[in-house]
C-alpha cells in the first residue's frame, strides 16, 4: 500500500509541529509587565490580605532581603553562574514579588533552611507556604525481634 503525496506531506507536517508552551501571566499581565509596575499598581493585582499588607508599607527587613537578592543575582550574572547564591532568611511572612523571580531563598522552618527557587507561579504568596514547619509522621507497627525492640514496645503482641 503506497501513501499518496498529499497524505505524506500532512503526516510529516503534523510530526514536525513544535509544541508551544503557555507563557505565564499573573492576572492577565506577563512577567515583563509585572517587573515594570510600581508597588502601588502591583498591589492592586493581589488579593485583599496581600494588598492590605502592601498598603501598610514594607518594613526594613523585607527591603533588606530584596537588596540581598539583587546583589546575589548581580554576582551570579557577573560570574556566569546558572543559579544565584542562596540567601538565607527567617522572614517567612515575606510576600513574593516579581523582582524575586529566579532567586534562591533559604527559608527557615524552625530547624533548618529549606532552599526555594522562586518561580513566576509563586507571585503573591508568602515564603512560608513553600517551607513546611512540620513533616508527616510515619507510625510503624510494633514488632518483636531478637534485639532491644521487644523491651521498648508498649503494645502487647500475642505469640503465635
UniProtKB/Swiss-Prot annotation:
It comes from the Eukaryota. One of its GO terms (cellular component) is cytosolic small ribosomal subunit. HAMAP family: Ribosomal_uS19. This is Small ribosomal subunit protein uS19v. It is found in: Cytoplasm. The gene is RPS15F. The keyword Cytoplasm applies. SUPFAM superfamilies: Ribosomal protein S19 (SSF54570). GO terms for biological process: translation. Belongs to the universal ribosomal protein uS19 family. GO terms for molecular function: RNA binding; structural constituent of ribosome. Keywords: Cytoplasm, Ribonucleoprotein, Ribosomal protein. It comes from Arabidopsis thaliana. The keyword Ribonucleoprotein applies.
